[in-house]
Amino acid sequence: MAQLAKFDVPEELTNKALEALELARDTGKIKKGTNEATKAIERGNAKLVLIAEDIEPAEIVAHIGPLSEEKKAPYIFIKNQKELGAASGLGVSCATVAIVDAGKAAEMVQDIAQKLEALK
């Protein structure tokens, strides 16, 4: 498996990101799937991008990290694509999700973004 993550994310922060995703899903707006997330990042709409680490082949999501950095969108790696899919409200696994409107999770997303910046 290719190593996608450029930095280690504490499990506590990963769990907080999944919690923020669930809240944003219910009170805001999210984009599910690599194509939708890519469009949100390119348009500058992504507040937080969640990328599954266990994607095969890794090339499917390899562009997300560099694109997020270019567009100044915070991104975090989630260990398991099934967890990401479940938090997105999908019954299947998901490679990438972008939070476009955080809704009631706005403060959480901002806090996560600041902590991610400190990790890099």
Curated annotation (Swiss-Prot):
Domain of life of the native organism: Archaea
Subcellular location: Cytoplasm
Pfam families named among the record's database cross-references: Ribosomal_L7Ae (PF01248)
Main location per the UniProt record: cytoplasm
Alphabetized GO MF terms: ribonuclease P activity; rRNA binding; structural constituent of ribosome
Entry's Gene Ontology BP terms: ribosome biogenesis; translation; tRNA 5'-leader removal
One of the record's GO cellular component terms: cytoplasm
InterPro entries registered for this protein in UniProt: Ribosomal_eL30-like_sf, Ribosomal_eL8-like_CS, Ribosomal_eL8/eL30/eS12/Gad45, Ribosomal_eL8/Nhp2, Ribosomal_eL8_arc
Protein name: Large ribosomal subunit protein eL8
Subunit structure and binding partners: Part of the 50S ribosomal subunit. Probably part of the RNase P complex.
Family under the similarity heading: Belongs to the eukaryotic ribosomal protein eL8 family.
Protein role: Multifunctional RNA-binding protein that recognizes the K-turn motif in ribosomal RNA, the RNA component of RNase P, box H/ACA, box C/D and box C'/D' sRNAs.
